[in-house]
Swiss-Prot record:
It catalyses: Release of signal peptides from bacterial membrane prolipoproteins. Hydrolyzes -Xaa-Yaa-Zaa-|-(S,diacylglyceryl)Cys-, in which Xaa is hydrophobic (preferably Leu), and Yaa (Ala or Ser) and Zaa (Gly or Ala) have small, neutral side chains. This is Lipoprotein signal peptidase. It comes from Lactobacillus gasseri (strain ATCC 33323 / DSM 20243 / BCRC 14619 / CIP 102991 / JCM 1131 / KCTC 3163 / NCIMB 11718 / NCTC 13722 / AM63). The gene is lspA. This protein specifically catalyzes the removal of signal peptides from prolipoproteins. The keyword Membrane applies. Keywords: Aspartyl protease, Cell membrane, Hydrolase, Membrane, Protease, Transmembrane, Transmembrane helix. It is a multi-pass membrane protein.
Amino acid sequence: MKRAKQVLYLVISLLVVIADQGLKNYIVTNFKIGDEHTVIPGILSFTYLQNDGAAWNIFSGQMILFYLISIAAIAVVVYYLFNPKYKNWLFDTGLALVLGGIIGNFIDRLHLKYVIDMLQLDFVQFNIFNIADSAITVGIVLVFIYLIFMSEKD
């Protein structure tokens, strides 16, 4: 992968971390735990929660497990992101989003021992999540799209 593309994908990851940590800082500064504020009526609200587990609060309180999983996931993503064998923009963009999301939640776990969640979709019954979670989800979808529909063409 050319140096400029490597930098671009790292910038994407960095932007995810900055957006994630910036919104989390805003929420912590302006909300109390459980506070809800409508952003777009019927669509999106901010609701401040502290999650010491993973998705759906599974493995609650298992910080050592989350540290190990995060470090391993970062290593795997960085390996594939910088491996010249994998040079598709969709695959690499997906990995960059996943990397930024993992780092965003890892920062919370290291400093706070929990992850700050705040995004609530009001039009569907779904867990409250954050920007890092969204980046991981979108990134994984992009990687799967590449693997299912495009990888044999490369």
